[in-house]
């Protein structure tokens, strides 16, 4: 009897999915990947992987993906999702991230040979704690508090995570959840937000930095932690896969040390960056272009990014490597891919396909002169408002001080210098004649 286990993987052509594929193959596992029809990114999936065409939002198209030979078993890692830095609600986003997860859950329940599901959520789905408090796993995600789960993407992941946990408790679904933080490292063929940001820094195209911090993990560590959850993750439990925080300045310094990337000299305070981003978003509404940066991007630097990932360390054997090691390996990958030559960036650009939704780096793609002018205009406008407010405030203080001084002077003259029946002005005139 054939008792082979199939590893079913959605999102196999994405950044995390590709690395999961490679690690499963290295372990001698049989991997089947779900890929959108006409998705050009299929070329990045290792050739040993069995590719099945299907669409998360089309339940019927998922049946061949779930059907394995008689006598075989399967497990599924549901990694696919639509990612966006746009904080606003999107029907497509909800259809893919929530509706697609619902379809996966239904298929797992209808296929008893599918022994377990690992749902790849996000740390963004977990309600944020105040600064100074490490964020830990929770078991309730809805209703979402928009002040603690910010942005449509995070809210869609929170909704889908709750759906998985409800299916565990109500329908007997055998599943657990992993919450990756930001992703960093080699093999990002779609050039996602983080890799795009690194390329912009290396190119010298980031006009200025921002204060604040990220929480980024090496994609290979995330892949290993996700795979470990298949056999070690407890049913109905959630596991944070995160790292220590790193500032944008620290990241820039590491890139400078690794490949002589141009150093950024000015880092915007976050409150000023938020005002500028809001102005750029309004400008983008008029022009129809992507804003240079968004308030949501600024929020991700300003928010509490400290996570407690000890549960994953203790139960899954999850480990993290240093940022320096990851940066070194990613730069070497960029050189091997022809994205940079060790001293600068080449003209080659990776394809971005429908199957790998990406919106560029932390600062979106832009014309450098136009970008500098846009930021300069916003900075000047913001400082002008601050200056106007300061001048107005100083005038009010000055007027108040002068008025108070005059009252004090009059009281002094009246009490110590004036003769009986003499006014303050008469006293001043008399004294001035002496």
Regions found by a protein language model. Give the residues of each.
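Mid/C-terminal beta-alpha module of Rossmann-like enzyme folds, strongest
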Residues: 225-293, 309, 314, 324-355
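Substrate-positioning beta->alpha
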Residues: 193, 210-230, 236-237
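Conserved Rossmann-fold NAD(P)-dependent oxidoreductase catalytic core, especially the SDR/UDP-sugar
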Residues: 91, 99-151
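NAD(P)H-binding glycine-rich loop region in Rossmannoid oxidoreductase-like domains
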Residues: 40, 49-99, 103, 107
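NAD(P)-dependent short-chain dehydrogenase/reductase
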Residues: 171-177, 181-214
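Conserved catalytic-site region of short-chain dehydrogenase/reductase
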Residues: 85, 123-134, 183-187, 192
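N-terminal Rossmann NAD(P)H-binding glycine-rich loop of SDR-like oxidoreductase domains
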Residues: 5-27
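Active-site Tyr-X1-5-Lys
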Residues: 148-176
């Amino acid at each position: 009897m054939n008792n082979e286990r199939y590893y079913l993987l959605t999102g196999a052509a994405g950044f995390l999915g590709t690395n999961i594929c490679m690690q499963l193959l290295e372990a001698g596992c049989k991997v089947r990947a779900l890929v959108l029809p006409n998705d050009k990114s299929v070329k990045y999936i290792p050739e040993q992987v069995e590719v099945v065409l299907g669409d998360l939002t089309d339940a019927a198209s998922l049946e061949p993906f779930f059907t394995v030979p008689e006598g075989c078993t399967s497990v599924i890692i549901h990694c696919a999702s639509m990612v966006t830095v746009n904080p606003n609600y999107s029907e497509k986003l909800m259809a893919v991230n929530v509706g697609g997860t619902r379809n996966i859950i239904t298929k797992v329940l209808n296929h008893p040979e599918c022994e377990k599901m690992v749902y790849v959520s996000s740390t963004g789905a977990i309600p944020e704690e105040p600064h100074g408090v490490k964020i830990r796993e929770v078991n309730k995600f809805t209703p979402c508090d928009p002040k603690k789960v910010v942005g449509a993407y995070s809210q869609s992941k929170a909704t889908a995570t709750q759906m998985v946990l409800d299916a565990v408790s109500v329908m007997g679904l055998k599943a657990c959840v992993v919450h990756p933080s930001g992703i960093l490292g080699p093999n990002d063929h779609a050039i996602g937000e983080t890799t795009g940001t690194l390329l912009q820094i290396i190119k010298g195209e980031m006009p200025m930095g921002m204060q604040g911090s990220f929480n980024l993990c090496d994609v290979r560590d995330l892949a290993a932690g996700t795979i470990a959850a298949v056999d070690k993750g407890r049913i109905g439990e959630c596991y944070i896969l995160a790292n220590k925080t790193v500032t944008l300045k620290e990241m820039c310094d590491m890139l400078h040390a690794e490949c002589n990337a141009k150093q950024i000299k000015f880092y915007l305070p976050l409150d000023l960056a938020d005002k500028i981003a809001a102005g750029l978003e309004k400008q983008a509404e008029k022009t129809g272009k992507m804003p240079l940066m968004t308030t949501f991007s600024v929020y991700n630097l300003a928010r509490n990014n400290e996570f407690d990932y000890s549960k994953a360390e203790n139960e899954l054997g999850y480990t993290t490597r240093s940022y320096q090691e990851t940066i070194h390996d990613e730069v070497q990958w960029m050189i091997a891919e022809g994205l940079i030559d060790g001293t600068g960036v080449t003209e080659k650009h990776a394809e971005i396909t429908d199957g790998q939704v990406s919106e560029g780096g932390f600062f979106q793609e832009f014309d450098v002169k136009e970008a500098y002018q846009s930021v300069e205009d916003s900075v000047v406008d913001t400082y002008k408002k601050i200056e106007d407010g300061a001048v107005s405030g100083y005038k009010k203080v000055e007027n108040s001080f002068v008025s108070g001084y005059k009252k004090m002077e009059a009281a002094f003259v009246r009490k110590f210098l004036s003769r009986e029946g003499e006014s303050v002005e008469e006293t001043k005139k008399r004294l001035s004649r002496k």
